[in-house]
């Protein structure tokens, strides 16, 4: 979460899940995250600074911990560590203006899997195609391709990588490469879904009790 936006985040605890919805500063990337645990209560936590909270939690060496949730703060005492972290008041933070139900109800024209190693190879290729910050996904025959270039500019160095076999057709769809860098590669396998009508690309990542859904708006060519 803190990779995308680390200030002013609401975490909702409901139905045994810790849920958050955050967006990048330019709103081209939305992250909906779920962490499933054995919560026995419902509440909302208005966190002023996620990175600051994460740093203090990193000082705790226990694998599991119990944090007291008070009316305006989080409090911990144990294993030689004590801290009190103050929360924002209810209503101080607003959630991103996005209709998740609408997006979840989209018909996705194209779906495919990407693995962590392939994405990391694309990132390595970006050091060569350093003049652009765009990545294009498209099909060439029976192959899915990822191309780092800028089709709106001339004489731009480009790097193209075959991402695997494709049993579908996909016209070039462009994304901001920086948004891909913000993906948390928890699992080796990432499910990618594309709605070409609205130019929306979804990256689903699951690992044990964690679900991450990244929603990225496509760029103009």
Q: PLM features: residue spans?
A:
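Long, charge-dense
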Residues: 90-109
């Amino acid at each position: 979460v803190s990779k995308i936006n680390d200030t002013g985040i609401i975490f909702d605890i409901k139905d045994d899940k810790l849920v958050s919805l955050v967006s990048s500063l330019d709103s081209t990337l939305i992250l909906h995250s779920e962490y499933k645990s054995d919560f026995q209560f419902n509440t909302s936590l208005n966190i002023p600074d996620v990175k600051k909270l994460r740093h203090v939690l990193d000082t705790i060496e226990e694998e599991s911990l119990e944090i007291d949730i008070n009316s305006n703060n989080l409090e911990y005492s144990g294993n030689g560590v004590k801290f009190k972290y103050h929360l924002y008041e209810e209503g101080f933070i607003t959630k991103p203006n996005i209709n998740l139900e609408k997006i979840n109800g989209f018909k996705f024209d194209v779906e495919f899997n990407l693995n962590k190693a392939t994405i990391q190879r694309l990132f390595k290729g970006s050091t060569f195609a350093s003049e652009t910050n765009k990545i294009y996904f498209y099909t060439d025959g029976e192959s899915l391709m990822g191309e780092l270039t800028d089709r709106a500019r001339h004489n731009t160095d480009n790097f193209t990588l075959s991402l695997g076999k494709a049993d579908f057709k996909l016209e070039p769809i462009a994304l901001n490469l920086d948004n891909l860098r913000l993906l948390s590669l928890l699992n080796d396998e990432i499910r990618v879904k594309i709605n070409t009508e609205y130019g929306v690309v979804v990256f689903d990542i699951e690992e044990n009790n964690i679900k991450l859904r990244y929603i990225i708006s496509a760029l103009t060519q």
